[in-house]
Regions:
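Phospho-regulatory, Ser/Thr- and acidic-rich intrinsically disordered linkers and terminal tails
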Residues: 1-207
Length: 207
């Protein structure tokens, strides 16, 4: 996982928390490296996925997920980011766990939605059955809500205490390319066209 030269604490905290969200990940500053050098370095070290975090004036505003070695690459706008450091009531939060999480992928029913869900799914190893960590990607009207929880069982199977861990954010998919992020000539698989003239709004990811 890489991010630009840091200009604000918000992007720093967010990237630190993403490192825990995605198991087995490493966080690096991009510095002056060009994208092609980063991708080639990842390939040579047999890294399976590259996540690039973009920022504007220190605030995270974009996420690129590139599957290696051949793609695809998904581009997302990043909205409504709330890090653990932004939450005042820390006592109400659960502790960050590094166990492999169970995934909930909700309402990715179209072809593009299934493709997006698969891109996200491959960022996470298979969890152990006893893992008490949950990560949710829930699609509503093409905005993907990310939530991170842990749970504890108390007594019967229906008695579950769910605690949000953070961070939380929304994703807006705007492009999927068949190749890797450094391949400008790669064919587009999906491009968001929000200003298309249609009588009825068609959701791209789900119902």
């Amino acid at each position: 996982m890489m991010h630009p030269v840091l200009t604000d604490w918000s992007i720093l905290f967010f990237c630190q928390e993403l490192k825990v969200v995605f198991p087995n990940s490493q966080r690096m500053n991009r510095g002056g490296q060009v994208i092609s050098e980063i991708v080639e370095s990842c390939r040579s070290h047999e890294i399976t996925d590259l996540i690039l975090v973009h920022e504007h004036r220190g605030q995270p505003d974009g996420l690129i997920v590139c599957h290696l070695p051949l793609g695809p690459t998904a581009y997302f706008g990043l909205l409504n980011v709330v890090t653990r450091h932004d939450i005042k009531d820390r006592k109400a939060m659960g502790k960050m766990s590094e166990a492999y999480p169970h995934l909930i992928l909700d309402n990715f029913t179209t072809k593009t939605g299934e493709r997006t869900a698969n891109i996200m799914k491959h960022l996470f190893p298979v969890p152990k059955p006893e893992s008490k960590r949950l990560i949710t990607f829930a699609n509503r009207d093409d905005y993907i809500s990310f939530r991170h929880h842990i749970y504890e069982k108390h007594g019967g199977p229906k008695s579950i205490d769910l605690k949000e861990v953070g961070p939380r954010f929304e994703l807006r998919l705007y492009q999927i390319k068949r190749g890797t992020v450094d391949q400008s000539e790669a064919q587009n698989e999906f491009v968001l066209r929000p200003y298309m003239n249609t009588a009825k709004k068609q959701n791209s990811l789900g119902v």
